[in-house]
């Protein structure tokens, strides 16, 4: 058991039905700047690699959330890591999925800058018509970090706690991949981020945390203003990988965040082939600081 981990059992949420709809696929693809024709096809579009992060749109109420009965303050909730593992082909429009979410563990750790961070490992599993028995088609694992409010007397609206997610990933013993020199497979710079981009992604994914679009709410957390949804750049990176990998299925896609991305940042996406079936993607801000790193393993 990890130091500070609470010996607590969590009850899985009730399963719910998710019908993959072609209009939602295209909306998600547009919100994440997908260059892939299969995501925008007029018939049976294929879901983008991170599309299933939108599952919360199909939840009826709190009983379908792994968080049911657990308080969380969205002003101080950070996304440390995300991982998708695929055990079959990506769903196409019309696919009916059974989805069930659960918290596997929750524990505390002292941050390097002081204060207590609470880590939550949230797992969402997706099955096809077989229901929620047997191996899932897709498994999504999220590491969420709840941090403490800024110290009393700290000036509001000025902080940028850029390194907290990195501390979080180290704390849960995620091994950072060190890639050997390899082939650069894409190197692009996207247009400067806007709050409109954040809102489009929030609508497409169902992540409605107001910290990404509401200035007053963001400043109440100690931030200077709204900032990018972490999964936005993760989805853009995944789409660029799909455009390069073509028809080769991805088995695992993992992301960890290092720095917040802000309105006005024109993010640079660099994808490197690190092995016969593996890739690393670095997403950097205009100042050269890393926003996120993603790793992908394909099946061939």
Q: Model features per residue range: what roles?
A:
Residues 1-81, 153-155, 165-247:
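Hot-dog-fold acyl-thioester-processing enzymes
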Residues 1-3, 81, 85-190, 257-300:
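HotDog/MaoC-like acyl-thioester-processing domains
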Residues 225-228, 232-267, 272-274, 283-286:
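Catalytic-pocket segment enriched in acidic/His residues
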């Amino acid at each position: 058991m990890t130091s500070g981990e609470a010996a607590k059992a969590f009850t899985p949420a009730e399963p719910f039905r998710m019908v993959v709809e072609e209009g939602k696929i295209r909306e998600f693809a547009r919100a994440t700047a997908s260059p892939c024709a299969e995501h925008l096809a007029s018939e049976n579009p294929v879901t983008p690699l991170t599309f299933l992060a939108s599952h919360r749109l199909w939840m009826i109420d709190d009983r379908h959330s792994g968080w049911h009965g657990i308080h969380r303050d969205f002003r101080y909730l950070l996304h440390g890591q995300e991982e998708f593992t695929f055990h079959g082909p990506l769903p196409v429009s019309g696919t009916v999925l059974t989805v069930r979410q659960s918290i596997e563990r929750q524990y505390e750790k002292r941050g390097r800058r002081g204060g207590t961070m609470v880590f939550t490992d949230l797992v969402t599993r997706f099955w096809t018509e077989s229901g929620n028995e047997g191996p899932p088609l897709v498994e999504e694992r999220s590491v969420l970090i709840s941090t403490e409010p800024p110290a009393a007397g700290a000036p509001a609206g000025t902080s940028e706690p850029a390194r907290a997610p990195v501390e979080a990933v180290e704390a849960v013993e995620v091994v950072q991949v060190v890639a050997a020199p390899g082939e650069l497979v894409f190197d692009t710079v996207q247009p400067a981020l806007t709050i409109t981009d954040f809102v489009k992604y929030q609508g497409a994914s169902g992540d409605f945390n107001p910290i990404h679009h509401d200035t007053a709410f963001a400043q109440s957390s100690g931030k200077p203003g709204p900032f990018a949804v972490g999964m936005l750049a993760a989805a853009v990176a995944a789409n660029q990988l799909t455009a390069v990998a073509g028809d080769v299925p991805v088995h695992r896609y993992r992301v960890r965040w290092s720095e917040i991305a802000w309105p006005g940042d024109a993010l640079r996406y660099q994808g490197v082939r690190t092995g016969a079936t593996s890739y690393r993607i670095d997403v950097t801000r205009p100042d050269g600081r890393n926003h996120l790193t993603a790793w992908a393993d394909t099946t061939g």
